[in-house]
Amino acid sequence: MDVRCINWFESHGENRFLYLKSRCRNGETVFIRFPHYFYYVVTDEIYQSLAPPPFNARPMGKMRTIDIDETISYNLDIKDRKCSVADMWLIEEPKKRNIQNATMDEFLNISWFYISNGISPDGCYSLDDQYLTKINNGCYHCGDPRNCFAKEIPRFDIPRSYLFLDIECHFDKKFPSVFINPISHTSYCYIDLSGKRLLFTLINEEMLTEQEIQEAVDRGCLRIQSLMEMDYERELVLCSEIVLLQIAKQLLELTFDYIVTFNGHNFDLRYITNRLELLTGEKIIFRSPDKKEAVHLCIYERNQSSHKGVGGMANTTFHVNNNNGTIFFDLYSFIQKSEKLDSYKLDSISKNAFSCMGKVLNRGVREMTFIGDDTTDAKGKAAVFAKVLTTGNYVTVDDIICKVIHKDIWENGFKVVLSCPTLTNDTYKLSFGKDDVDLAQMYKDYNLNIALDMARYCIHDACLCQYLWEYYGVETKTDAGASTYVLPQSMVFEYKASTVIKGPLLKLLLETKTILVRSETKQKFPYEGGKVFAPKQKMFSNNVLIFDYNSLYPNVCIFGNLSPETLVGVVVSSNRLEEEINNQLLLQKYPPPRYITVHCEPRLPNLISEIAIFDRSIEGTIPRLLRTFLAERARYKKMLKQATSSTEKAIYDSMQYTYKIIANSVYGLMGFRNSALYSYASAKSCTSIGRRMILYLESVLNGAELSNGMLRFANPLSNPFYMDDRDINPIVKTSLPIDYRFRFRSVYGDTDSVFTEIDSQDVDKSIEIAKELERLINSRVLFNNFKIEFEAVYKNLIMQSKKKYTTMKYSASSNSKSVPERINKGTSETRRDVSKFHKNMIKIYKTRLSEMLSEGRMNSNQVCIDILRSLETDLRSEFDSRSSPLELFMLSRMHHLNYKSADNPNMYLVTEYNKNNPETIELGERYYFAYICPANVPWTKKLVNIKTYETIIDRSFKLGSDQRIFYEVYFKRLTSEIVNLLDNKVLCISFFERMFGSRPTFYEA
């Protein structure tokens, strides 16, 4: 029997079992049950002394045990690391057992199962039937997995089954209550093993009149009275809420491969199961494949107060306890962990994922027609957009949300007519968000037409789950994660990096016959992070070349062989004499390149020097682990370059990014005290070497010159750690034209990247030169495994401060005719605590600054005068006209209790609001507020006690005739940011004092 593993899961009853859900070549699903064991590693001496004897034991052969406690010394008399070799045994017990002096107890039992039996969690195997005992149709017991799964075979494709769902609930306040608010709609996207896709929505008929129900039937809806009458081929079905819930129960109890929701673990599934129990007393029940254990659907929470989220709220995750092999997958939780976005609402995520450049085909009266295909955007983007458009009801054109009037869709493109104001450009960016509807108002005016409209919105949200599933390549990532982390598919995204790293670490330790032990308590000290340079100026009219180190920290660990067992010791000094003696003797006793000595900042205030010494002769555990991850990343990057469609590119890009993150997380885990990889000296040495590498690159580029086909680097090309046999001559021949004459200046750097200004505004030449620079740096400047990559040309760069800048980005693969991407790194445009007015204005002024830099007709003083003069005109005009709507000035904040002071004004504001309003603001909820003052208050220069002007803005709020927006608060914040973009501090201070009666705060460089 040939099978492919698709999921592993446990039953937690009186008799614990491990189950495999697998699929045969013919699409048949087969479950295999295994005994569940707890695993212990002991020496032969302990094994022989155990009473009673172990349930099962396997010899592991001779293994080397290394004590990885850090040795701290004030001189070079460092004792050798304790190391011993002994015969070891792996013990399997069906129940937990207290065994003294067992080692390797930090690893997961499931990882031991896979590795000890030679099984890959996502592998394909030809099973030996003699080791299988049939339990029932489709379920077998296996007591000897090692022999049963001995024959691994090449991977083969199998079909998968899915259920994507969404619900809508009636509510009369801000959030539905399971006790009083019925479910109005449930929508499903059902894909079976044959690939057949069914879309259907159940509508609660109890919220409609009998006349409306009859009209719905006349319009083609199916009306059913019981579960037995359900026809899944029909798109719209009317039924009572009880029948609606019974159908949900039936579907959720089926053994799909995946049941996918968006925030369903926290809301949809919880609401369905609670509502079902409330109305019928029934529960959703899952049964194990052997039919011997039944569990009720239950959502349980994990609260990790050690991982605080925004506003001090504990990081809470939600999990479904099922035992039937289905993976309940919450896209909301997954995207939060894997993507860094401004917002994790479904509309924001969809807008980020599904966009396409569309060409204007026709302009009508308040409507426009767009066409999209492979000629209007990158290959595949229009096809993905068209797929989402099949259920989409609204399309966003730039920032304008437009209703779909008509749509034509074909294989690789679309034509769509939108209700839209007349726009003048020929092409626009079209994107998808969640349908732009006011559900509260729709329920208030609820009737048949609204119910049918909501059905369309609900099924679109269910389908969005499918589209996002495919966009993020979740299935590919799940299988790759299971293989890489040595974890079940259902657990790949459950754990943090400190846990997922344990599987590959255990595998490596067993391959190298190594056991790492500690006898001392782990100590935690602070240490310096990556190097961030201060920006050398604010605005750049010349182009800036961006060079990034490839996986800097992982490659630092590989270069220095940084690992707890390769650390020879740490030499510290408390006075200058000690330091001088140690420095003189150090290189004699520990000569490079076998050893590397890393100067770090002292761990304690009474020390003046600290040097870590690593042995590079035998590759350590951490470098070996990193090589595996980097090799996988390189494989997916190669596949990314060869991919032809945007979908393939998105999946391979996300896969290489996954391996990048896990490789980079190893550095973080070295400094995390609860990690199996914890090594304070290694983590500290990693950042120290990283800082020296970025300083080295900056030193050779800052002041470099190109002329007559020769590049003269600014300094000799000397290895900053030890002398080697490389040519250090800074003059290098290039393949560039001999008439090129350019100078280079390093203007900024951040951890693993260097920003280098070239005295040119020509994008094509800048890219050409940067690519040659990349080649020369990698071949002549850098050494060992260090490499850099030319990332982009930044045009019209505006540096606000460290880690804050705005620019137009031309990627390495583009040219001067390409459309540049606007980048806002760490600026107000990307923050949620900034008003739309502020964002709009700062965007206008940054664009204006960018244009001034491009034209190059003004010096920095003239630019400053022009910008400040224009800003004053705009602010005075807005203050006098008061024409902008209140929504442009609204801010949002999360309500929480994590305040140092009990009488915090934010807490007082919400408490007073809740006293006087039926729709109270709950903990963890975001609320909107604005600064409001009396209408007769003149322009206020000196702003005091501005917290007292905060007013919560809800749906019922209307700005009274005796009130106005307290514009000065917003103007001052906007002006503070703009003056930080300008170079002339004297003019900025004078302007700010005249407008607001105080000096501005300038960002620290």
UniProtKB/Swiss-Prot annotation:
The gene is OPG071. It catalyses: DNA(n) + a 2'-deoxyribonucleoside 5'-triphosphate = DNA(n+1) + diphosphate. PANTHER family: DNA POLYMERASE CATALYTIC SUBUNIT (PTHR10322), DNA POLYMERASE DELTA CATALYTIC SUBUNIT (PTHR10322:SF23). Pfam families: DNA_pol_B, DNA_pol_B_3, DNA_pol_B_exo1, DNAP_B_exo_N. The lineage of its organism: Viruses, Varidnaviria, Bamfordvirae, Nucleocytoviricota, Pokkesviricetes. Catalyzes DNA synthesis. Acquires processivity by associating with a heterodimeric processivity factor comprised of the viral OPG148 and OPG116 proteins, thereby forming the DNA polymerase holoenzyme. Displays 3'- to 5' exonuclease activity. Might participate in viral DNA recombination. Does not perform OPG116/D4synthesis across an abasic site. It comes from Variola virus. Belongs to the DNA polymerase type-B family. Induction: Expressed in the early phase of the viral replicative cycle. One of its GO terms (biological process) is viral DNA genome replication. Interacts with OPG148. Component of the Uracil-DNA glycosylase(UDG)-OPG148-polymerase complex; OPG148 and OPG116/UDG form a heterodimeric processivity factor that associates with OPG071 to form the processive polymerase holoenzyme. This is DNA polymerase. InterPro entries: DNA-dir_DNA_pol_B, DNA-dir_DNA_pol_B_CS, DNA-dir_DNA_pol_B_exonuc, DNA-dir_DNA_pol_B_multi_dom, DNA-dir_DNA_pol_B_vir_insert, DNA/RNA_pol_sf, DNA_pol_palm_dom_sf, DNA_pol_type-B. Its EC number is 2.7.7.7, 3.1.11.-.
